[in-house]
């Protein structure tokens, strides 16, 4: 290897060389590749492509030319890089889903929203669009500076005239070294209105500009959620804009629904979006979707169809899709552009100010150019006028000259003409010597003088020049402006949760003995008088019956406590809403129960984070525990331990308390104990608890409830044979925790063991459910108030092999109030007893009443008289028992 001469070797520190070389590279990428110019919104490659199209005459009125020809010309003259980078840039300018206002009119396959690439450049053709001409208009009138190309053999524009604000109209994105830009597209009409407002009020605020420019306007349309992100981006140059697909929920027959997506967020790959949805369904992260189809076509546009299972809530599924898929995404705004050749972060007003200044410069330079041309022409016309005034002398002088040069010099000396004027006279044809041509020259000269005066007036007055800019922008707006595509929705969408999409209403959740669960509107059940037959609450399977029932709001939490001492959580709306006769869905489809685990208690809670509330637990063996509600604020899908106990024990009931209540525990043999809640110290979530009541042989806990110290509430007792009564809470004295309790009812074969012990105020309705699925709703105030030892009065007449399985309180609301004149009538029986007929409670939908089925509604008068006499005998027996009441068993 030959040695290099010493003079060609320069020793440098490697650290300095790396620093300087990398800086040179970085600046080259920033200035000459990745960032757009603030004036025309174009990167060098886009500018060179458009200029190349213009130079080749590929205007909209000409035929398409092969893309390979365009790419080759641009690469050879202006852009010495790979042909693929040039072609990809041109393809993007032709895509109507990438550019709000496409700058290239492509013919052939130019890609799709599914990420499909364009066909090879040898197959596609292109030309300029009409709006592209406005970027290049007046480029040959010295409106911008030209620079040498890469080899110095060609000239290329340093910037385009850009007669519309392309930087914001089509946006830009690019990654440089140490910085990146991401500018969203906007609506041309709004942008030009904003520029016009700025031109009239240079001190305009960004808030005032936003009255004209609402926000980005994406080519794929869709929705923008809220204006806070837009405002932040416009004020600072940086911000995050929430984009969302446009989706509607359609009915598809049979009570089924589908979600149809017709617009997707900007720059989202539709095929990948669909794959993501399918992946979530496959992994069971989103439940309730039965089918997913892409029905997009040229005729219908974007159309992605998502079929929803019949028992699923389409609104909730759609909300989850927004959260977990690209159906909702964000656009990170970073408005960096080249300002005077340097990268700078700009806000909305700065972008418009720089554009307006560029337009003023373009119009000023064009005016100056036109003025020069007009003066040059006027100068020539002045010479021609002189020639026509002295035509004979001009002809004589020319004839006497030996050469053109001598003739020109003679004309200049004799008639005081310039070289250009003399040359124009020598070039003048003889036909211009006619009288008609002389008149034309005079008319043209006078017009030029007026035109020169107008041009000088424009240059002399900045306001006149600015008005010209306004007029030209207005013309472009009227020609190319269109309606906004992207809708901006106002509201707190950033924190949108499932319940925001669910109307809040009172519901009933039922759980059957065989663990089938469902929800119904509370208005499904209608109020009846004591002793009514009830309505069919569900069509139960053989040997199945409703075992539990709670009322709550669709937005409330439902805590499910199991016999094994575990707790699970659902929102009210997450339980499927089914028909009144439906059996429901298996509870294991809603919550992940363990083997041999059944729900023992369901309670509704509004705020799980509350520090002022507690949960009190009672087990079958008389163990009681108090734990803070906040311990249960985070319940996993697979549940958590709520209480620990021995293997032969199980959880009976849970109650929500304020911490200052009295605890009431009742047993199946009609014992009840009352003690202050304060005697129970709060324990951890997994703690075992302490003894609450001492049980006799064969007895077990069936009820748990709470009451205030000076409460006017009453204790409601319901037995398995359909008897019940109310007794004032204060009839039960306070005792120490762990005692045996006092008698709360007399148990006989007629009324049976106690199935429910709870507290009431008298303002509630009561729902009584039998093992046959029959539900009756009655006013608690209609139930007789008796002493502690009374058996109670009949609340519901039971058929053979029927017994009361569960009882629940329902708060009265407006839907439950019936109008005597319109919804109920009263009749008097032969023995003077007033009996009220059933009332129909209107559904929430106006004009649509729910007519519930009546079980064995045909009853004769004799049955009614027997019922009254039996009730009278019950009351006599209760009085006898009261006189023999013993406080302690």
From Swiss-Prot:
Gene3D superfamilies given in the database record:
3.30.1360.40, DNA gyrase/topoisomerase IV, subunit A, C-terminal (2.120.10.90), Topoisomerase II, domain 5 (3.90.199.10), Topoisomerase, domain 3 (1.10.268.10)
Q: Where is the composition biased (Acidic residues)?
A: 813-823, 876-889
Q: Where on this chain is GyrA-box (motif)?
A: 528-534
| Database matches in Pfam families | DNA_gyraseA_C, DNA_topoisoIV
Provide the protein's localization.
Answer: Cytoplasm
Q: How does it assemble?
A: Heterotetramer, composed of two GyrA and two GyrB chains. In the heterotetramer, GyrA contains the active site tyrosine that forms a transient covalent intermediate with DNA, while GyrB binds cofactors and catalyzes ATP hydrolysis.
Which is a Gene Ontology cellular component entry for this protein? chromosome
Instruction: Locate the active site.
Output: 123 (o-(5'-phospho-dna)-tyrosine intermediate)
- Keywords per UniProt: Antibiotic resistance, ATP-binding, Cytoplasm, DNA-binding, Isomerase, Nucleotide-binding, Topoisomerase
Q: What else is known?
A: Few gyrases are as efficient as E.coli at forming negative supercoils. Not all organisms have 2 type II topoisomerases; in organisms with a single type II topoisomerase this enzyme also has to decatenate newly replicated chromosomes.
Q: Where is the composition biased (Basic and acidic residues)?
A: 863-875
Q: What is its main location?
A: cytoplasm
Q: What NCBIfam families does this protein map onto?
A: gyrA (TIGR01063), PRK05560.1 (NF004043), PRK05561.1 (NF004044)
Q: Which family does it belong to?
A: Belongs to the type II topoisomerase GyrA/ParC subunit family.
Region described as Disordered: 811-889
Protein name (database record)? DNA gyrase subunit A
**Xref: CDD domains:** TOP4c
Q: Which PROSITE patterns match?
A: TOPO_IIA
User: In UniProt terms, what is the effect of altering residue 85 to P?
Assistant: Resistant to fluoroquinolones
Q: Does the keyword Cell inner membrane apply?
A: no
Q: Which GO terms describe its biological process?
A: DNA topological change; DNA-templated DNA replication; response to antibiotic
As for what it does, the entry says:
A type II topoisomerase that negatively supercoils closed circular double-stranded (ds) DNA in an ATP-dependent manner to modulate DNA topology and maintain chromosomes in an underwound state. Negative supercoiling favors strand separation, and DNA replication, transcription, recombination and repair, all of which involve strand separation. Also able to catalyze the interconversion of other topological isomers of dsDNA rings, including catenanes and knotted rings. Type II topoisomerases break and join 2 DNA strands simultaneously in an ATP-dependent manner.
Residue ranges of domain Topo IIA-type catalytic in the record: 35-501
Could you state a single Gene Ontology molecular function term? DNA negative supercoiling activity
The protein's Enzyme Commission number: 5.6.2.2
Q: Where is the signal peptide?
A: none
